[in-house]
């Protein structure tokens, strides 16, 4: 089984080394690692080159790509798609430049995939960490059929997807700036694909990010997406509740 990782980055020098250190410390290292850089002007590219020099002698293929720009395409899902198109692995993980793995993350994913060969993706619980390094909570994957109309039921940083699944249902919709992952999970669910699960948290996610800083747009996108897939009434209720609570 060939495992590929993708990290998209832009001026990520503050957190990137922590992410890369967690990859080098894996008990099962990735076979391939592709970076899509959005035009960094800080030390991001230097850090990536240093990582490449450390990783490649162990057999990991590392490529650093400049992000391609497409008119009217949201930058983050567009960069994800560029990485997906470039990698050659059987399973693909997306590691954000401010997130990091537990040392057993990829080994755990591989074990679950071997035990559930018919699944389309694997979901890992993700630990939310504040700016001081303290755990706020753990986001455990939720039942898609119950929670999908209301919320994103899976932590995207903990999602490892087979390349065959992307081939079957497509990559990310670049029309959504914030909630392209939510749209993708809806398509996964509608296609009737199976999801397998890792029991323990394997990913650490630093709180913040685009969705948390643009809550109104995130609410509007999730309402639009859920309505598109036939859950307008439930999605509208969830939208109103989030509007009232400011979430």
Q: Which sequence ranges carry the predicted segments?
A:
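Cell-envelope/extracellular polymer assembly enzymes that use nucleotide-activated donors
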Residues: 2-4, 32, 183
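Short beta-strand/loop segment that forms part of the nucleotide-sugar
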Residues: 31-39, 63-69
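Short, acidic, metal-binding catalytic loop of nucleotide-sugar glycosyltransferases
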Residues: 21-30
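A conserved acidic beta->alpha catalytic loop
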Residues: 37-46, 96
